[in-house]
Amino acid sequence: MQTITTSYAGPTNTRGSRILVKSWLKNKAFGWDYSLNSEANHKVAAQQLVDVLNADRIKQGYADFQWSIVAAGSMPDGKGNAYIIDLIEAK
């Protein structure tokens, strides 16, 4: 079981708004989708990281179990979300 956290990073002079996604296994930033609301942007970014982690597992020969989001909630400070991921047997 792992935790993924997401947080919003506003635009700078060189980069647009994005969601920062952090986990023990990997950290990434994903661009903000202006067609989605804030909650959906965080959820999509977390799922994108899960997809990256699963691709890494397949490359390493561990395709029998895949990461999947099993629970989600907002952070206590209100500055992002937390997602619990666990390895689930691949179908």
Predicted region positions:
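Catalytic phosphate/metal-binding cores of nucleic-acid and nucleotide-processing enzymes, i.e., regions
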Residues: 1-91
